[in-house]
A protein has these predicted regions:
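Hinge/beta->alpha junction and helix N-cap segments in small-molecule ligand-binding domains
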Residues: 1-12, 27-33, 56-59, 76-84
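A generic structural signal for alpha->beta connector loops
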Residues: 49, 69-70, 107
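Short, well-structured alpha-helical segments in soluble
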Residues: 8-22
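Periplasmic-binding protein-like
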Residues: 20-30, 49-55, 74
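Hinge/cleft segment of the Venus flytrap/periplasmic-binding protein
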Residues: 80-129
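Short beta-strand elements at the ligand-binding edges of bilobed clamshell
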Residues: 67-79
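Alpha-helical structural signal in soluble globular domains
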Residues: 19, 36-44, 64
């Protein structure tokens, strides 16, 4: 089941960490779970004990990178995903399937606190096409 509610992710993460104090790494695979997990880590004061990797980004997760509740973000490129997906669909519908690559890499950028303000990270976090 994929969680899409940050509050539920916060509650579940807090319960998981309380029940298993030996956990020192968390990976949250979408934006809402990244937000909720970061909130739980911060509320429990575990910024120094738990290494949290989140996917995608928003104001809350970027702030978490700055304050320490998030240690890394895997930032995808939704513009490229949408654009290249539509382009591929167009080629299929217009008989140009032979021009399609079997795999399309839309790129990701791993953003840490240490490279948060680099040009590449800023482009990934605030991409507009």
């Amino acid at each position: 089941t994929t969680l899409v509610d940050a509050e539920q992710a916060r509650e579940d993460t807090a319960a998981l960490l309380a029940g298993h104090p030996d956990i020192n790494v968390l990976v949250a695979f979408n934006e809402p779970t990244s937000v909720g997990a970061a909130q739980a880590v911060e509320e429990l004061g575990l910024e120094e004990q738990v290494f949290l990797v989140g996917f995608d980004s928003n104001v809350a997760t970027i702030e978490g990178l700055q304050t320490g509740s998030v240690d890394a973000l895997v930032v995808q490129n939704p513009y490229a995903m949408g654009y290249l997906g539509v382009e591929s669909a167009y080629r299929l519908l217009t008989g140009q399937a032979e021009e399609l690559a079997p795999m399309v890499d839309t790129s990701t950028q791993i953003v840490y606190r240490s490279n948060l303000f680099s040009l590449d990270s800023q482009k990934a976090l605030f991409a507009f096409g």
